[in-house]
Structures are given as C-alpha cells and as structure tokens.
Amino acid sequence: FITCTPLNKAELIKIVPFLLNRTSKEQASEFSVSFYAMNGDKAIRYVYSVLLETTHIVRETLIYYLSQQPATVFERSMENNVSSIKFGQKVKISTAAKEEITLKCLPNMSVFAAYMQVNTNIAEMETALQYLTKQMMPAIVPTSSLSRYAEEAIKKETAKEYILRYLQEADFNISNISSKEQETKKGVVNYTMYQHKVSSGLGGNDYYEFPELYESDGTIRTFGLASQIQNSIGSNAFLAVDEIESSLH
C-alpha cells in the first residue's frame, strides 16, 4: 500500500475490515506503526498512521520526535473528495513541490506514493520511506513456512546461539541444533538435527539426536519463529506475527 500507485482514483484499496460484528465493515480501518530510524548517530522516533476505507484515505499522518514533543512531517485529509496535504513547519519543501505532491495524490493512494513521483527530496520522508519499504518484514501467518530460513540461519554462530537460547527459554530441552547435508540421487539435501538433553536418573545427562520428522509441530514452529525474531532484531526491522500461538506448546 505504501508505494502502490493506482491506475485511477476509482480503483479500490485492498483492505479487509473486521467482519465479526455488524458495524465494523461499515467503518474505516486504522493502522499505525511506531519505529526508530537513525539520523546520524541519533535514533529518532517516527509514527505513521492511516485511516482508510476501500475507496479512499480518510486521514494519513507522519510525525517524528526530535524532542519529547512530536513534530508533524505531513498531515493528509479529505476535503470535498480531494486530498489535502499539510506539511510541518520544520519540513523543508518548496511551494511548487507541495502543489505537485498534492495534485498527484489520488484519494486512494498514500502520500508516500505521490511523493515518489515528484522530483524532490524531503529528508524526513526519505528516512521514513526507507524504513517502511526496507525494514518491514513480510507478516508471519499460520501457513507461513519458516523452516528453510531457520535452517540457513543456524549456520551462523550468532543466530544459532540466539535460537538455542530462545528454545531453551521456551522450556524445550534442546541442547543443540545442527544443519547437515546428505547426498542423494537428486543432489545434496539439507536437513536439521535436534539434540535433546535428558536426565539419565543417575545424576548425569544423556543426549539424543532426532531429525525434524520426529519433532513436534510446536518445536518446528518455535524454531522457525525464533530465527525470524532474531533477524528482525538484528535488522532493526518490524515483524508482524498473526496467531503467534498457532501450533506452539
């Protein structure tokens, strides 16, 4: 949505409202994300918010915090079925650029999408746009396959340490995870082995290794989820997880 440019102002916005009551589908949907982006050696907090219906954007704002008080980058609303955009006092932008962005901003597109079509540079918008387009990871849903990425992640020692710690804190008795290769007629196949630590009953511990086939869905799901969370932290990225409890113990 952020960078999507519709063919015309009649094109519908692809949103699905909450449907489990009688009123929500008749109301506008709202989305807001708060994030930190670097400005030199200082992390600046930004908040992007949008209120929209399938036909048009009702309200859209971008604010940031250079101090404890928020400052406006832009504020967009609808006036007589036409987009109206106001830029903050601290934003450096020419009158001509303001007018061009407003003219290009159809009712069913974001201010960012209109901005990207104009030959101008607004530092605050560039910073926010970079984060929203480069550091918003694909959402994880119950049908998302996470194992392949996790199998690659554990080849890196730092990622492996984090994933193991995550699994252990989730009360799994997994003491090690290793990625292995096997030659087959179809080529090299990668697979993951899980090492479990079990009390021997004699004051010591026994260790058993099992392939993924013998692990529960909860273990596999947590393994994949841990790798994605580690990636989001390392990349300072935003990660949305739908039904996080799905298949977890």
Where are these regions (language model features)?
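Conserved ABC ATPase signature
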Residues: K186-H249
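Short, glycine/acidic-rich beta->alpha junctions
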Residues: K25-Q27, K42, A159, R221, ...
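Short, well-ordered loop/turn elements at secondary-structure boundaries
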Residues: Q27-A28, D171-N173, G234-S235
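Short, solvent-exposed loop/turn elements at beta->coil junctions and helix N-caps
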Residues: P17-N21, K180-K185
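Conserved P-loop NTP-binding catalytic core
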Residues: F1-T54
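Electropositive, glycine-dotted interaction segments
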Residues: D41-E183
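Short acidic, glycine-rich loop/turn motifs
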Residues: V33-D41, Y64, H196-G203
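A generic structural signal for beta-strand entry/edge sites
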Residues: A28-E30, V82, G187-Y191
